[in-house]
């Protein structure tokens, strides 16, 4: 009996020690201070084009923060979440869906969400700055597709499964009208511009893009609005985030946040950010801003 009591006391002591260590680790786990800031993007356009466009941002950030900055273009959103988890990336320009996945795993915290000019239902850019956007389903005008239910049996061009506007919101919208993943033929395409080109070439019947990705192709495809139509637009989606790895120190969160805010306020900086993602500015964000995204994720995952 005494041996059992001794073992029990020893076990309880061990649990208390480990618990104390865990609390100690947690207390000191948010103290990362980068010596070189690693920033990562996922392309919403041609990745080769984006690689060239991010270099000026690298220089601006380095100047603002006073340390070397290395910018990298990720292959997809899943790779970016993994890079945050493995602490290979400090700052991520990450979609709302990928942010919620990363945050729920404890590997990312949101700093800012982007602002952009509102695009109306005709594809015209207004002068109203908003912190949301929408996803849309686009088809060619010469086909028989007029509403979501018509997509049963169609070949649909979608983005990465963690893309907010290119996968999650359109798939959730389809499920709401009883069109399941098994009811469509999915063609995974990298880049919203490439999806629209595939549609114009007749490689797919419909594509999901952000509203209104067609505007980005008007110069190369002047008839894109004449030849295509949006048959559906989703509810509001919170804009893309600038997030940091989960163990970033509070001081550096503030520094990074202020650096991006300052860059976005200058004409030179605004042009750089517009060229990369169409961002017109930023505002501070909190995790609860993205609860609606979690609801759409859950609907797709069910």
Segments from the language model and where they lie:
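C-terminal motif of bacterial Sec signal peptides marking the signal peptidase cleavage site
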Residues: 17-20
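Bacterial signal peptide processing site
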Residues: 22-24
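Extracytoplasmic small-molecule ligand-binding "clamshell" domains
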Residues: 30-100, 105
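An extracytoplasmic/periplasmic, membrane-proximal ligand-sensing/linker region
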Residues: 32-41, 45-65, 244, 248-302
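Bilobed "Venus flytrap"/periplasmic-binding protein-like clamshell domains
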Residues: 34, 40-63, 74, 115, ...
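Acidic, polar ligand-binding/catalytic clefts
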Residues: 82-150
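A ligand-binding cleft/hinge motif common to bilobed small-molecule-binding domains
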Residues: 93-107, 175-176, 200-201, 205-225
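Short beta-strand->loop
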Residues: 108-130, 185, 218-236
């Amino acid at each position: 009996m005494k041996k059992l009591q001794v073992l029990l006391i020893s076990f309880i002591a061990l649990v208390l020690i480990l618990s104390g260590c865990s609390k100690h680790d947690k207390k000191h786990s948010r103290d990362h201070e980068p010596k070189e800031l690693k920033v990562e993007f996922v392309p919403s356009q041609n990745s080769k084009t984006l690689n060239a466009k991010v270099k000026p941002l690298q220089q601006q950030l380095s100047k603002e923060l006073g340390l070397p900055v290395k910018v990298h273009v990720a292959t997809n959103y899943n790779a970016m979440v993994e890079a945050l988890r493995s602490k290979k990336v400090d700052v991520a320009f990450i979609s709302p869906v990928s942010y919620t996945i990363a945050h729920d795993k404890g590997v990312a915290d949101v700093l800012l969400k982007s602002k952009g000019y509102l695009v109306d239902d005709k594809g015209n850019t207004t002068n109203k700055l908003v912190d949301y956007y929408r996803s849309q389903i686009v088809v060619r005008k010469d086909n028989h597709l007029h509403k979501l239910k018509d997509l049963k049996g169609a070949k649909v061009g979608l983005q990465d499964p963690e893309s907010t506007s290119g996968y999650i919101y359109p798939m959730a919208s389809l499920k709401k009208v009883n069109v399941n993943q098994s009811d469509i033929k999915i063609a995974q395409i990298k880049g919203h511009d490439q999806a629209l080109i595939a549609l114009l070439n007749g490689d797919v019947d419909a594509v999901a893009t952000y509203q209104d990705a067609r505007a980005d192709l008007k110069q190369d495809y002047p008839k894109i609005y004449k030849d295509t139509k949006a048959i559906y637009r989703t509810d509001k989606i919170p804009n893309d985030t600038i997030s940091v790895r989960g163990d970033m120190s509070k001081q550096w969160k503030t520094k990074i946040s202020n650096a991006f805010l300052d860059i976005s306020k200058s004409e030179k900086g605004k042009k750089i950010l517009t060229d990369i993602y169409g961002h017109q500015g930023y505002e501070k964000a909190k995790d609860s801003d993205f609860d609606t995204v979690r609801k759409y994720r859950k609907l797709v995952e069910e």
